[in-house]
Amino acid sequence: AFEAGADYCTVLGCTDLLTIEGCLKAAEKAGRRLFVDMITVEDMDARVRQLEAIGVTHIAAHTGTDRQAAGGTPLEDLCILKAAAKKSVISVAGGIRPETVETYLAAGADVVIVGGGICHADDPAAAARAIWDKLQGE
């Protein structure tokens, strides 16, 4: 992915630490960044400690679409990650829309990732503008 121009890559946080270390080394070699996606990770506190111990600096709270359909959001996971991380950038993804983005900013998200909140909006351009404005504090 890095050879194709990607600035970031993602690896699942539930995978083996050796796999994550390999991905981290590839990112470092390319001068790029790796995000560890914590979707389905059960003991986030312990996993964050393990990840930071091997040099991970970017961790993502992420709620999948099935969990969103059942009413789940990434807010609780974001709060857990923010409390557990000592030196990592924490991103949030999953179900974020223009009307909810401020909640995640207030909870301390360093990076907000929006997909369906733009792509599935009635007016994707307006949704993107609204999110951008909120990220800029407008």
Regions found by a protein language model. Name each.
Residues 6, 107-109:
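As written
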Residues 11, 37, 91-93, 114-115, ...:
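Thr-Gly-centered strand-to-loop micro-motif
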Residues 37, 82-86, 108, 126, ...:
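A general structural signal for short secondary-structure boundary/capping elements
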Residues 1-87:
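Conserved anion-binding
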Residues 18, 46, 73-76, 99, ...:
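Conserved active-site and cofactor/substrate-binding residues in soluble primary-metabolism enzymes
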Residues 77-105, 112:
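A C-terminal functional module that forms or caps the active site or interfaces directly
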Residues 64-67, 95-99, 118-119:
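Short Gly/Pro-enriched loop/turn and capping motifs at secondary-structure junctions
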Residues 23, 78, 105, 116-138:
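C-terminal helical cap(s) of enzyme catalytic domains, especially alpha/beta-barrels
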